[in-house]
Amino acid sequence: MSVDNPGADFDVLGGIEPSQVRVRFPPSPTGNLHVGNVRSALFNWAFARHYGGTFVLRIEDTDAARSTEESLRGVLDSLRWLGIDWDEGPEVGGPYAPYLQSERRDKYAEVVQRLIEGGYAYRDHYTREEIEALGEQAIHRDPANPCPTLSAEEIEIRDRAGEYVIRMHVPDHDISFDDLVRGRVTFTAENVPDYVIVRTGGDPLYTLVNPVDDALMGITHVLRGEDLLSSTPRQLVMYAALAELGVGSGRTPIFGHLPIVMGEGNRRLSKRDKGSGLAEYQELGYLPEGLLNYLALLGWAIAEDRDVFTKAEMAEAFDIRRVSGNPARFDPRKCLAINAAHIRMLDDDTLAAAIVPFLVRAGLVTDPPQPEQWELVRGATPLIKERLNTLSEAVDKLRFLFTADDAIEIEEKATLKPEEASVLDAAITAVEGLPEFTDVQVEQALRGSLVEGLGLKPKLAFGPVRTAITGSKVSPPLFESMALLGRESSLTRLRRARATVA
């Protein structure tokens, strides 16, 4: 394979109107979506939305042994959670239904028969050992006589027994195409042999169903991972044959191969790697917009000096020619930082509502929350907003608000010292007589009593109070937290903590 020239000057649309753009995302329902798959879905979605085209969701479930209804449901739910909506596909329908490949087998069988009759494909009755013995002679064979060393009788015997595969004939010449990301790509003839499209037993393979569905569904552009680059010349052969047979639109899609996503150790990120599955990010409380923003940066940038943007802004600015062909490294820390930026972009009501499911899961609030629980969440949200990287972090930060006063446990590292008893005594005296228990009045009372009255530095003055109120040395802003808890709870906690100090 050789690659020449960047793709920046290519005609992206290939002569069609922008609204005629049709792209597809074809996941296999064999497990949770991988972040690499999500990146591909996002780039296809952004490409379609940028041009006002059509985003097709097509399910590649021909592997019956591994495809499950549960996984299919997971794919659909995950895309909805991400906000990647599809114009055609499962549960939406469309002019090229069905969109599950398992329901399109009759179409594939019909196309295979036409390919054989047209001399584009053939039944291969050779065994693997016989093919190896042929060596280079097996690379490109005559569809009219693909097994010349077998007798007619032996071919008939193997045919009746179903002992054959169906191969696509590949012309014996180099295959070149223009890639929107990589420029001119050429594969030499010896590297693109005749290939199997239907395995023994009749199951169609990806090498058949993928380009057949592209042709039948009028797909104009194929944006996918670099790992599939080597399959492109075979698909180009199939597109050409289908066009000559009058199958589909007769148009060969324009390809763009996205950079590989690398994980730790400079290895390609795989499904087995920690941090590669979408479900992990949902569980941790990443925002869909934050995760998509970071995945967009794996090979593309909205501007040289800007990393944070929305999905809508990406769609408006997206240019496939600006996608880099170099491998993109997945950086968990940057992903976390981008997510934190998106959390800070939310208004307080929206963020509070997003936090609630994590508090429910932790057993801190009911589902739905009681009115007083919601008021606590809503009141505390602006206190922790700047400190959150993920939504799940809110659980530990807010746990003290939803814990009974007599159940607050002081962390070992925050254990109160005997000399801090006087601080707690002064704090109790300072706040128990306040006319109003607001954060401003609590702060004024405690500063006056502890900092000015006892002559303590703020850290030494407020540390024991924070421990008594929250059980920890680290918490949301102290005075606002006490105001949220109210006078009674705050005093109960202060007195209970004071009783534990000798």
Region annotations inferred by a language model:
Residues I59-D63, E226, P259-M262, C335:
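Acidic, glycine-rich active-site loops and adjacent beta-strand->loop/helix elements
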